[in-house]
Amino acid sequence: MDVTRFTHPIDLRAVSITDPFWQRETELVRREVIPYQWEALNDRIPGAEKSWCMHNFRLAGRIMAQYRQQGAQYTPQAYTYRGYDALPDDPAHPDEDKFYGFVFQDTDFSKWIEAVGYSLIQHPDEALEATADEAIDVVCAAQTPEGYLDTYYIINGMDGVFQNLRDHHELYCLGHLIEGAVSYYQATGKDKLLRAACRFADYVADFFGTADGQCKGYPGHEIAEMALVRLYEVTKDEKYLRLSRFFINERGQEPNYFVEEERRNAEREHRPVRSVNLAYHQAVKPVREQDEAMGHAVRAVYLYSGMADVARMTGDDSLKSACERLWRNIVQEKLYITGGIGATQIGEAFSYAYDLPNDTAYSETCAAIGLAFFARRMLQMSPQREYGDVMELALYNTVLSGMALDGKSFFYVNPLSVVPSACHADSRLQHVKTVRQKWFGCACCPPNIARIVSSIAAYAFTENEDTLLTHLYLGGSIRKTFPTGTLTLSIASDMPWDGHITVTLHADAPVSGMLGFRLPGWCPNPNVTADKPVRVVDGYAYLSGEWHDGETIVLDFPMPVRLNRANNRVREDMRQVAVTRGPVTFCAEQADNGENLHLLRVDVEDFGKDGEGVQVLPDSRFGHRTVKLLVPGFRQQEDAEGALYAPYQSAAESPCQIELIPYYAWCNRGEGEMRVWLNV
């Protein structure tokens, strides 16, 4: 592996987003989502589930203040098990001296501050920065003198620290703290939170490792692996890279740490040993031997992202090969057409090959975000069209579906078929919400959306010394410094609705360098027009040479409306089709088509080979410009009540136009049915 050719995300300061789509999304996060989520973290959203996040930090800070005041006279609390999700007996009158929420509740803050950092990089805001500084003071006051920082154990008793890595998320909290601290440091230059994150990471590095007396465990919920690599990149302290590599290398080794941990805990708690679902934790075998994505989907893709980071930083071919195998397994057998992953609510997990149900789909928002993390890291090592295609699919569909268009309500799961009456009556669908929620007790998804949307430019563009790669077509300006000078790209784009993109180059003097552009897989006949030769490798068009002020590159990506079928191993989608245009997956909604969407079928003949029979119309009903599709079809006549079964005969049906909207925009007009896969 030639690590010198790998790329890294572009500095957000070098990008200004002006296109109508992503500018709206990033501005929504800046103006609405970040302030709203700060209120949620402080339990000030009427009618929403409480976060308890800042409550816990303030309580932990008071405990640490007592510790500092009393010194040797301080008597620490013996560990009291509070459960995985601790709630007050009387929600209206919570105890001020108790931890509430999930064991990982601290991460609500960490993801919020990460989004704040990205936003401040692009839009300095004194008031927001002051709020963030006050929050950081509260969080840092909770840290122990030794560097440990997890409010669950600081409040409930430190003698339980690192005794339940499988379930209690301390290393997950570390990972998100690092990500947030790095983002805020890069935005403001203020290092208070970064120093706190480093102290916690140092505490962990002393505790874990292969030396005598060190713990050979690893995270139950992965993210520390990629966060530690990021901390290494900022601090240049190789200890953090070594720790990440240790966690990855140790996972799944025999004797299995999680099995041994369970035996120890059962003995200490005087209870029978319970079975450990190693697949759920991606710990069935060492990571380099894994070839199937399994278990909790978010944990899995966070692990794979960390593996890709370590492979990139260390030149580890065996780790890169494992990432490639796991990637292929996901995209060939376990990926929804909306870019979602994790088919089953049982364990929020990947299911078996080709098991992709629509109405019971879990497809967690965080899992799609994690898939985008994984894709971007694979692109950094090896620019291949498929990685960019899947990243784009996840971002434009499941990720954005997770947040309402006003930024104030959210989906945790993202099914591809919803019938509200069924969801309300069927306990098998209890995980499916028919409208977005103001907040969640387990609120991993809302701040996750905020942090990826506010850093979208880092997914669109990566670079190394002499190359700039464009993976997503965001309109705006991008400044790239090559060894011979600085080149600014002005990109005129109306993606995802129009595939005509013009890149105009600006430079004070001639600049030499390479530019690469992804040729999307959804476009059958991409065209690149420029004054330089175009070389296509792995679905990327490369142009290199000396660039002059005013040169243009025109990319034309025709966007036919496509009728898609699933592999016939996907039983749930037999004799059904899904409609896509460009990177956007479309769906039918009750608001446009009435009830009983299962009675609709697409007229495949009139649809046309390239969607000639489909009307593509502008649509401004959702507060910003989108398109809607009018698809030729039929509606079957609804049977009368009475006989449940009858002799077969062709059903009576009448022609109709099926109106489709972008999947991400569904359920912004009230509760109603929705369906992605339509009958034929």
Listing of model-derived features with the role each one plays in the protein:
Residues 1-108, 133-153:
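Low-complexity, Ser/Thr/Pro/Gly-enriched N-terminal "stalk/linker" regions
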Residues 3-6, 67-70, 93-109, 160-173, ...:
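Solvent-exposed loop and edge beta-strand segments that line ligand/cofactor-binding
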Residues 5, 10-12, 19, 120-133, ...:
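Structural helix-adjacent loops and short alpha-helical linkers that scaffold large soluble proteins
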Residues 14, 244, 323, 389-397, ...:
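C-terminal beta-rich recognition modules with glycine/proline-rich loops and embedded aromatic residues
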Residues 22, 113-126, 175-190, 224-236, ...:
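Well-ordered alpha-helical scaffold segments within catalytic/enzyme domains
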Residues 156-234:
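A conserved hydrophobic secondary-structure block that centers on an alpha-helix together
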Residues 510-530:
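Beta-strand-rich binding/interaction modules
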Residues 523-544, 562-569:
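Solvent-exposed beta-strand/loop surfaces of large extracellular or lumenal domains
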